[in-house]
Amino acid sequence: MKNSLWTVFLFALLFTPASIASDGFSIKEVSEDLIVFNQGGKQSILIVNEESSILVDPLNEHTAKQIQGFLTSNSKPMISHIIYSHSHWDRISTGTAFLNKDVEVIAQQACGLYLSSNQAVLKPTKYFQNYLEITVGGKTIDLYYYGPSHGECMIIIHLVKENLLFIPDLLHTKGARFPMDPTLPYLRPATLINFFIELETLVEKKEIKSFITGHTGIKLTGSTSIIAEQRVFWELMQTTAEQAEEDGIINLDNFIDLEKLDLEPYQQYENYSSEDLINIIRRYTSFQNMGR
């Protein structure tokens, strides 16, 4: 009951946030202790308590300095923890923005390989494998890893008090859709469906109703029912690739002959294009044939 009441309260706040914007950088104070910030179409979150602030994905050096300036000018505690949601450099390249050696930087274990050679990335001080609970100043944040999905080490972040998820990629708050990058260099077909199944299990167990993504959109939050809808999309891609192989409509370069495919099931999804569908099916057939 407590979680349900907080969810209603949170949704009311999400539609009336206090906003601050400058130089392409903007901040939405969703509540007293939850802040959403964005820069150039990417967004992330800042969790503030009486003792310190916890930053998820500082994005880049400019954004990190803007966040530090916001905290200072609003008499809010400085950052004690930084959480990397995954290893992609466009979300974590802070440069020299953080000089405080006491900041704990947390990442999933598989991220280490991708972070070791980039001097613009503040190196993690703590790695975890499957689950980590962070409790600071009475705030609890749970980190979950469900295997490779969007890259090798993307995690799910659960804000326990708000009962809200931060899902950095693979989902959109408006609903299931084609991905923004159809070349899918990051996609891991071998474990993607299991990732969604595990995420659905978490949502059901914790009775989580809403999520925020790592990309700006018309809606700040989305319903967690979208998780199952997006899983169905990827299952469709997988079964299409498998059936196309059986039907012999995939050529030697792993391109599908769309003229021999009923396109209606795919056209219902937002951001559909035939070129993107070809690329996605090619990604799956490449995996089926070569394991890559």
Language-model region placement:
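Divalent metal-coordination and catalytic microenvironments
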Residues: 33, 47, 57, 71, ...
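Metallo-beta-lactamase
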Residues: 22-24, 28-30, 52-53, 60, 109-153, 160-161, ...
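Positively charged n-region of N-terminal signal peptides that target proteins for export
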Residues: 1-5
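Conserved beta-strand hairpin/beta-sheet module of binuclear metal-dependent hydrolase folds
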Residues: 25-69, 155-169
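Bacterial N-terminal signal peptides
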Residues: 7-17
